[in-house]
Amino acid sequence: KKRGYVFISVPSGYEVSSTGVLPDFHKKIKRDELEVVQVDFNLNPVSGQDQHIMYVLGDLHLAGRNDDLKQFDMFAEDLNEQIKDNQSRRQYIMTLGDMTWEIYWNSYNFSSYLKTMNYSFENIQVFHTIGNHDHDVDAEGDFNTVLEYFDYVGPNYYSFNIGKVHYVILDDILCKNTGAGTSESRKYADEVDEEQLEWLKADLGYVDPSMTVVVASHAPMY
C-alpha cells in the first residue's frame, strides 16, 4: 500500500482495458495502511496470443530538444506501418526504460511523454520498463525517486502473460540520490532490490514450467 497502487499479472488469453497506450493492469489506492479496499479488474478474453508480436523500444530519451520529437514521429510512422502490415496478429509494445530525461522534466515530463505516445499509437498496449533517467533527480533515496513514475506510468516492477510467454518487468536501478536536484547528485547502482526478488520468487511460483519467461530491465544483468 505504500506504493499507492495494486496490480495483477494479466493471465494468458486475456487483456485488460487501456487508458491510451497504458494497459489497465494496475489501479491506484490510498496509502492508508489501516483502510481496507477492494479493487476489481475486468479481463477481456482474446484469441491468437500464441503468435503475438512484441515490439521492443529502448532509450527513447524524449525531452523536446535537438529535434528528438521530430525523429520520434518518423520512427513511429515506420513502426505503425509494421503494425498495419501485421494486423492479423496480436501486437504489443514494450519499452526498456529511459523514455524520458529527468533533468529536462521542467519542459518535457511524463505527462508530455504520454501525450506523445497516445498521439503516435492507437489500439496497441505499451508495457513500460523504468530506466535510470525515469527516476526523479530531485528526490532523495530510492523509493521517493519513483513516486512520479507511479503516478503517471505505473508500477516499476510487475509481470504479465501473453500466449505461452510470461513477461517479467524489473526495476534494476537502485537510486542513492542526495536530493540536490542536479545530475551530479543522482547516484545509483545497477541492482534489483530484495523486495523485488521476494516478489519475483512468488511470481514465478505460479508460472507453468512449460512457459517461456522473458525478463526485461533497463540495465544489463551481467
Positions of predicted regions on the chain:
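A short, solvent-exposed beta-strand micro-motif common in secreted/extracellular proteins
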Residues: 1-19
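Short, intrinsically disordered, charge-balanced linker/junction segments flanking boundaries
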Residues: 2, 196-199, 213-222
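Extended active-site neighborhood of metal-dependent phosphoesterases/phosphodiesterases
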Residues: 13-23, 28, 104-207
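N-terminal active-site segment of His-dependent metallophosphoesterases
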Residues: 19-26, 30-107
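A general structural motif
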Residues: 51, 89-90, 123, 209-212
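Active-site-proximal beta-strand elements of phosphoester/diester hydrolases
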Residues: 51-64, 164-178, 214-216
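Active-site neighborhood of phospho(di)ester-bond hydrolases with catalytic His/Asp-centered motifs
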Residues: 56-58, 92-98, 125-132, 214-218
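Short, solvent-exposed loop/turn segments at secondary-structure junctions
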Residues: 61-62, 100, 134-135, 173-175, ...
